[in-house]
């Protein structure tokens, strides 16, 4: 058993997944049969906390923020890499990135429509970027003005609108939250093209800011299913800090599930937790699915519909619906979850190509 992962017994498949397994059994190259499971054991409190997630199998990932405005282009030139990394990929200084906030006015955002699209596809939970690596917050935070309520003409708290819409569809609301923060004056390390030494950064102050925002997210928006952390790989973030953050989450909402990116145990993009004393309740393979089942280990593969997470207007490399359904079956048959991403545009619209595939699923 890998450290940081909960031992569990045979999980029941959600009705949607059972239907998919039956419907795809004749497809060529269909997913392998479930791997042998660990022996059944009495439920523990940890198992009870994880039960809904283990039965869910299928969730929606939403990457949305200021990066949807440039949409993969800067100063008239296309920028390589995924859309949400444009500040880093194009080596944009914070002072040049900040004006995007004044342009962010997603008048077509409709929380109910987003939630319905997820529910109609059979998804059981929604994970949205409360804050990505650019530090911009989609919620009204009292600890910064670098957020949608203070820095944009939109002025509305995205999370405050999305959470009740998601719950009204019978799904769990979950937050993605980046530890790495290219914007914050106290975050370290700095980007080489924008060192800003005059700010005299102090990572302990940044850590206090991070914990304060996590407290807001787990206090002001009702019950949260998962805290999905990311950006933990830089050397200023340590395993003791991760344990403290994990404990903070559980102290505010004891039933919340926390992924393994809260600490330092994740082993690259394959996402599973290394041996050792690492915090986190499940592994997070990224853009891949484990080749076999992993008895006794909870995991979730997060994957894109095209080649980017955040909206990128020229990325038209869409996976077929058949491929997406096979991925879902592959994950479910091996005992894992499938977290499928959509990247809304700057007006708040989920791309038609994504909506088409969700309907077809």
Residue ranges and their predicted role:
Residues 4-5, 25, 29, 59:
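A composition/secondary-structure signal for short, hydrophobic, low-basic-content segments
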Residues 8-9, 29, 33:
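Low-complexity, intrinsically disordered or signal/transmembrane-proximal segments
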Residues 31-361:
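Mature catalytic domains of secreted/periplasmic carbohydrate-active enzymes
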Residues 1-2, 310:
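Accessible peptide chain termini
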Residues 14-26:
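Bacterial N-terminal signal peptides
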Residues 2-17:
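Bacterial N-terminal signal peptides that target proteins for export
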């Amino acid at each position: 058993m890998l450290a940081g992962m909960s031992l569990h017994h045979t999980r029941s498949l959600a009705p949607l997944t059972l239907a998919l397994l039956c419907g795809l059994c004749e497809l060529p190259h269909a997913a392998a049969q479930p791997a042998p499971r660990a022996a059944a054991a009495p439920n523990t409190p940890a198992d009870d906390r994880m039960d809904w997630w283990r039965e869910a199998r299928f969730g929606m990932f939403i990457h949305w923020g200021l990066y949807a405005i440039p949409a993969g282009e800067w100063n008239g030139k296309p920028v390589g890499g995924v859309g949400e990394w444009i500040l880093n990929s194009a080596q944009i200084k914070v002072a040049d990135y900040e004006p995007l906030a004044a342009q962010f006015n997603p008048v077509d955002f409709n929380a109910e429509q987003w939630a319905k699209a997820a529910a109609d596809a059979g998804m059981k939970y929604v994970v949205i970027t409360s804050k990505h690596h650019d530090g911009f917050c989609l919620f009204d935070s009292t600890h910064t003005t670098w957020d949608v309520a203070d820095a944009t003409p939109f002025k509305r708290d995205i999370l405050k609108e999305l959470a009740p819409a998601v719950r009204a569809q019978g799904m769990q609301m979950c937050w993605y939250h980046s530890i790495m923060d290219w914007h914050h004056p106290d975050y370290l390390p700095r980007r080489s093209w924008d060192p800003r030494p005059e700010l005299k950064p102090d990572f302990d102050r940044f850590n206090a800011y991070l914990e304060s925002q996590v407290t807001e997210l787990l206090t002001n928006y009702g019950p949260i299913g998962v805290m999905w952390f990311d950006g933990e790989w830089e050397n200023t973030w340590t395993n003791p800090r991760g344990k403290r953050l994990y404990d903070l989450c559980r102290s505010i909402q004891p039933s919340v599930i926390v992924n393994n990116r809260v600490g330092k145990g994740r082993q690259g993009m394959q996402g599973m937790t290394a041996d050792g004393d690492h915090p986190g309740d499940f592994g997070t393979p990224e853009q891949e699915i484990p080749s076999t089942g992993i008895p006794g280990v909870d995991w979730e593969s997060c994957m894109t519909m095209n080649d980017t997470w955040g909206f990128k207007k020229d990325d038209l490399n869409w996976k077929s619906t058949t491929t997406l359904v096979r991925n879902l079956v592959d994950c479910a048959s091996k005992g894992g979850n499938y977290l499928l991403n959509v990247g809304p545009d700057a007006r708040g619209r989920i791309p038609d190509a994504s909506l088409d595939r969700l309907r077809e699923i």
